[in-house]
Curated annotation (Swiss-Prot):
NAD(+) binds at A121, N181. HAMAP family: NadX (MF_01265). It holds the Pfam family Asp_DH_C. The keyword Transmembrane helix does not apply. SUPFAM superfamilies: Glyceraldehyde-3-phosphate dehydrogenase-like, C-terminal domain, NAD(P)-binding Rossmann-fold domains. This is L-aspartate dehydrogenase 1. It comes from Bordetella bronchiseptica (strain ATCC BAA-588 / NCTC 13252 / RB50) (Alcaligenes bronchisepticus). Its EC number is 1.4.1.21.
Length: 258
């Protein structure tokens, strides 16, 4: 295709710029039509920035990728979808809010838009979604991260080593809004936010974010594991997350939320 894919972005931080870099290297031409930020004058990087969603949508993006956190997704997702523009959310954990998820699905259906859930930092999301049709009884996500990947983004004390959290995916995204968005993707692909179990561990010796997905049911069972290097010291996201956002923006490798 010679016609550039027009992509908008919510946010202009490390993750957004990494994702834009991947898009720039694709065989199909891609035009970043703009980033939605609070203060365009303070935005990092060379991407064009806009201070309002109206200005961003005026650039006629075909798809918008959210890279700015759960609050930004809650604020802007509905107007983007209502404009008939597909949405790729990085902050999938926000969709644990049943009312928000319902409103976004309603807006998408009315406008003919899609919510494209990226695979994020994990492999095996497609397999989990397929297994759901056969029957899934249990799903466990276990994340092991160095202290810096967690302590900077949560309030309250955390242990120096070992288990920092055990609970449901719904509880995890509330406790770790910057670190547990992957659990939202797993919950949506599988058995939901309340039945998906999550363990978050701290390992001072870890040099990467380790993600494990274990599932069991009538289909059988599987165990997937990814050791993901982080984008930078200033970002909790694994490098593969930026790649998954780029892939979903290009139209493949995503879970269509319904």
């Amino acid at each position: 295709m010679n016609t550039p894919l027009r992509v908008g972005i919510v946010g202009c931080g490390v993750l957004a710029n990494a994702m834009a870099g991947h898009l720039a290297r694709q065989p199909r031409p891609v035009e970043i039509v703009g980033c939605l930020v609070r203060d365009p004058g303070r935005a990092r990087g060379a991407l064009p920035c806009h201070g309002s969603w109206e200005a961003l949508l005026a650039q006629r993006p075909e798809v918008v990728v959210e890279c700015a956190g759960q609050a930004a997704l809650a604020q802007y997702a509905q107007v983007i979808l209502a404009a008939g523009v597909d949405l790729v959310p990085a902050s999938v954990g926000a969709l644990a809010d049943d009312a928000l998820r319902g409103a976004l699905l309603e807006a998408a259906a009315a406008a003919g838009a899609r919510i494209r859930i990226p695979s994020g930092a994990m492999v095996g999301i497609d397999g989990l979604a397929a297994a759901r049709h056969v029957g899934v009884a249990e799903v466990l996500y276990r994340g092991t991260m160095p202290p810096v990947a967690l302590q900077r983004y949560v309030s309250g004390p955390l242990p120096e080593r070992g288990l920092a959290f055990a609970g449901s995916a719904r509880e995890a995204v509330a406790r770790f809004p910057k670190n547990a968005n992957l659990t939202g993707t797993i919950a949506l692909a599988g058995i939901g936010f309340d039945r998906t179990r999550v363990e978050m561990l701290i390992d001072p010796d870890a040099t990467a974010n380790v993600h494990e997905l274990l599932a069991r049911g009538e289909f059988g069972d599987f165990h997937a594991r990814v050791s993901g290097l982080r984008i930078s010291e200033s970002s909790p996201s694994s490098r593969i997350v930026a790649g998954s956002l780029a892939q979903a923006a290009l139209g493949s490798g995503f879970l269509a939320l319904s």
